[in-house]
Amino acid sequence: MVNKNDEFKLNITGYTSEGGGVGKFHGQAIFVENTAVGDEILCHIIKAKKTYAIGKAMKIIKPSKSRIEPECDAFKSCGGCSFGHIKYEEELKYKAQKVEDAFKRIGGISPAFKPIISSPETTRYRNKAQYPVRRENGILNIGFYAKKSHRVIDGGDCLLQPEDFTKIIEIFKAWINENNITVYNEEIGIGLLRHIYLRKAFATGEIMVCTVINGISLPNSEELLEKLKSVAGFKTLVVNINREKTNVVLGEKCLNLYGDGYITDILCGVKITLSPHSFYQVN
């Protein structure tokens, strides 16, 4: 059994359901984030339990053939994606194996599986993003939650989102700072701006901007609107009111400040209208 602060060499032999690496040390499972199958690492134990332990890769002694350098600078801290450090082919292999294992373990059957179909697009494919807005030590952060926390990591130019979203977030940062807009403090439940919720219809190019606020109105919205009009495809600005102390992003009530309050996409020849509350597969 390993103990906290132990250090040893570890070979990563599998992945967890969340995409982290796992290896065995004297029969005990050791979970290590940001590792790839085939990595040989120097592992430092940060939490030890009877049946498993959580480690940190202090050094990659021998990198896996599947390992790549993450394109995103925030990958190690941001919880937005799990596989930025491995080749796309390895990611597909893992996902296919995960499905097959579920059929065998849970269903007790072993059907024949066709090869997984790869996507031609591995970046910029998501049509929706919900950005929490926070201040930490006076610094404004708009991005995604850090792994296993509600601390917000500034998203920068997230490679999973359309480039238009990055421009919109920069507009919001300037507008917030120039107009002293308060941002939500989750611990005490005060502050106005909670989330920025963006949607893009890829077939039409239309973009919806929704601000989620802990209040009843959005101050200086005219200035924000004029800046948003510089974004190609911007179609509508909606304010969603959520005054509950909750982790749920959207409240029930929406106010339409500009446009129709929805955007239109086309999927398999069918025209679809999308409001803030619409369910639509994100990728």
What does each model-identified segment do?
Residues 2-282:
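Accessory RNA-recognition modules of RNA-modification enzymes
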